[in-house]
């Protein structure tokens, strides 16, 4: 299967190409950052940029292991700079180089160097890095394949959208899994290896965690409660009741590590009436539902929250800041905020064919009295648009592919 095009992320790189600003792509391991660089470099070569003008270093590869010292990295790059040419510098998985920002800052001030970097966790853009490069970089968050990208990859398969959705949430949306569609054990091994790398290599090593089983128990608890309101106290109490004694501070620390690894997303609650954030229990969502399938195989028992997770990730892909909407009575699944403060409200339900279910799902949206757009996303087939007092019901698969 050829490389999967990632038009949204490619467009980001194209927009900022040759601008005096550092391009930063962050995202969980194996979500496609290296492939994105390869696709963009192919475009550069097609646009008459020569191979000598491209310096590409992937710090996950053994051949570049010696460049994890920032001084050696500086020398390596400096030797390859052609002063009379425009140079394109790609630093992939830069978090492996302590003090890398000193190298980036040095080459940034040279007019003929266009810089692109990636990292696989939230902390590689540390406060020191952000301070040094303030105003000098633009950042985009990269996620695994969207449902639309997944459907496009299977465009010649003849499979229905519904079948592809089931594959998408059960088999996983990491690009590397597309080559293993018929190999169940291969997919399991790939996901287990990726999970071990993210959890054991990134989180355990960075936080110096001794009790790996406790960390795994916390992950399982979160996965079993996707889309539910939880906090460290609730997790600690549940694990302690099950015989795993743990305090709130430890759970909080482990949760922060899981978020920093980009495996989990903490979604804060938003007071719809007062238009402000609340310091209440958040909800958590996972970067790919296949991780839940890996640890908790009976995914069908929680189809509603699985769909909710898919919608949450898609809203993030589209550039929204996403919150849980808190009402005086009840809540709205998602309050999505665009840059500039414009809001949209989303309720997600597998089906609202039953009138009682439909009324229950519409009620939170009807309670909102402002004029921002309101959407009800369901799996129900719609042969014509449905509108309930300004609330637009959409087929969620249509919405996911942008129809």
Model-derived features: positions:
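Pre-Walker A adenine-sensing motif
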Residues: 3-18
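Hydrophobic anchor at the beta1->P-loop junction of P-loop NTPases
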Residues: 25
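Walker A/P-loop
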Residues: 34
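Short glycine-rich substrate-engagement loop in P-loop NTPases that contacts/grips substrate
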Residues: 55-84
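Conserved P-loop NTPase "ATPase switch" module shared by AAA+ and STAND
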Residues: 82-100
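Interdomain motor-coupling "hinge/lid" segment immediately C-terminal to the ATP-binding subdomain
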Residues: 120-122, 127-229, 265
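Accessory nucleic acid-recognition modules appended to NTPase machines
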Residues: 182-342
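Domain-level recognition of nuclease-like catalytic cores that cleave nucleotide substrates
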Residues: 381-403
